[in-house]
Amino acid sequence: MLFNKQLDKTLRVCPNCGHHFRIPAKVRIEQLVDSGSFVERDADLQPVDALGFVDLKAYPDRLMAAQLATGLRDAAVWGTATIDGRTVSLCVMDFGFIGGSMGSVVGEKVARAGEAALADRIPLIIVSSSGGARMQEGTYSLMQLVKTMGVVERVKAARVPFISVMTDPTTGGVFASFAVVGDVNIAEPNALIRFAGDRVSAGTIGEELPPGYQRAEFWFSHGFVDRIVARSRLREEIISLLAFLIAPPL
């Protein structure tokens, strides 16, 4: 049996088997950045129910429940911070908010994080934890794939470093857009990384797929992920990458 106090001491990683539990966005930020350096931007951005969408629950009711449970307005937090003294633009997704799904607000925050990185020529770091596009926002959600990719491609074209961190899970529209195109793609151990589920994937290509093909280790072995990094080493790894990617002043 594991107790929360034990897990808090190990960054929510099981000390026995190494399983990485999902963590809230603000906890992730505290683990990565220099103490007290994070300045959140656009915390007041609020999703709207443009479609009047109702499934088992009306979308506004679902949003309110998620906001009360997480203390967030939506499933992403972005801002600027320092990591080992280097200023970065950081966007972190929170799976606890409607499965970390990307709607108009999440897409806008990812885009604004990229725009800030571009404007100030500071590294962009995005930590993904998402079930994909938010179905309650329909086409508005799908539009975010294009918007986020457009900004990220401009960041890369300007030779501003982009580090993508994929955590469990990184799936659907987030996988199909910005999460997989970092200058360096990092994944946590055994993270679920995929576009669609087993049944859909197998049915689409008409053949049985290999075991573990949707896990970080498979993607790493095929060159899709550059590094698999345990949570306890993630800050240290990012510090090393920033030192490598950022040119020293002339």
Positions of predicted regions on the chain:
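A generic local secondary-structure boundary/capping motif
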Residues: 67-68, 78-80, 114-115, 152-153, ...
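A structural preference for short, pocket-lining loop segments at secondary-structure junctions
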Residues: 81-93, 109-133
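Conserved mixed alpha/beta catalytic, RNA-binding, or beta-rich assembly cores of soluble enzyme
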Residues: 95, 102-111, 144, 151
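Structural motif
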Residues: 5, 93, 127, 165-166
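Glycine-rich anion/phosphate-binding loops
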Residues: 62-65, 69-75, 100-115
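Conserved catalytic cores of soluble enzyme domains
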Residues: 128-250
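Intrinsically disordered, low-complexity segments enriched in small/flexible residues
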Residues: 1-75, 80-83, 241-250
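Short small-residue beta-strand/loop micro-motif enriched in glycine and branched aliphatics
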Residues: 98-101, 134
